[in-house]
Amino acid sequence: MKLSTDLRAFESRIGHAFREPDRLLRAVTHASLSSATRPDNQRLEFLGDRVLGLVMAEALLAADKAATEGQLAPRFNALVRKETCAAVAREVGLGDVLKLGRSEMMSGGRRKEALLGDALEAVIAAVYLDAGFEAARRLVLRLWGERIAQVEADARDAKTALQEWAQARGLPPPCYEAVDRSGPDHAPIFTVEVRLGNGETERSAAGTKRVAEQAAARALLARMEARDD
């Protein structure tokens, strides 16, 4: 089959020409337009999520050989969460080539974060099936670019990440409260609780309120993202 002009342009933007063009067509086809003869991208999204995770895990291990699992986990989550995938999808104009049903199109489907993130993962899977893991790896590293280099700083700012997570789900900004102080005056220990608008909370203790807030936010964000998965 031959791809349309807009899909050929999309191939150029992501730097991969498909040997089997139908794989790309399936990757950009939403469930709202699927049929017996036109499969949607849900199964590809499932596979692409795993390919993306493997590429990112390898990249993070290579970038910081001394990092612990606890240090790597928030960096990994920052790179693979739906908000990041959607941002990358927008940068390559994925929304412009999505194949949507009328109702999904009328409701702004081309701009929906979850839909864009899922479709990008489907594209990653399509490249993997079309040309193998190395091609998919090159694609991911190229599209994520400086995000991988910046992820350590981004992951440290867990309060911002948690606020973005909450806002993306229509929740108010997280609330932080110092609930305890212990230890001597010269070396106090502050316990801080963070609370989301959905009632979820997490506590953490540290030598300063700022560090305790960041630790509590990081722990709560990791728990919420694990539930999203």
UniProtKB/Swiss-Prot annotation:
SMART domains registered for this protein in UniProt: DSRM, RIBOc
GO molecular-function term, one example from the UniProt record: metal ion binding
Enzyme type, top EC level: hydrolase
Catalytic residues (UniProt): 49, 121
Binding positions (Mg(2+)): 45, 118, 121
Predominant localisation class: cytoplasm
UniProt keyword list: Cytoplasm, Endonuclease, Hydrolase, Magnesium, Metal-binding, mRNA processing, Nuclease, RNA-binding, rRNA processing, rRNA-binding, tRNA processing
Sequence ranges assigned to domain RNase III in this UniProt record: 7-132
InterPro entries recorded: dsRBD_dom, RNase_III, RNase_III_dom, RNase_III_sf
Domain of life: Bacteria
Signal peptide from the UniProt entry: none
One example of a Gene Ontology biological process annotation: regulation of gene expression
SUBUNIT field: Homodimer.
Record function comment: Digests double-stranded RNA. Involved in the processing of primary rRNA transcript to yield the immediate precursors to the large and small rRNAs (23S and 16S). Processes some mRNAs, and tRNAs when they are encoded in the rRNA operon. Processes pre-crRNA and tracrRNA of type II CRISPR loci if present in the organism.
Protein name, entry field: Ribonuclease 3
Lineage: Bacteria, Pseudomonadati, Pseudomonadota, Alphaproteobacteria, Rhodobacterales
Underlying gene: rnc
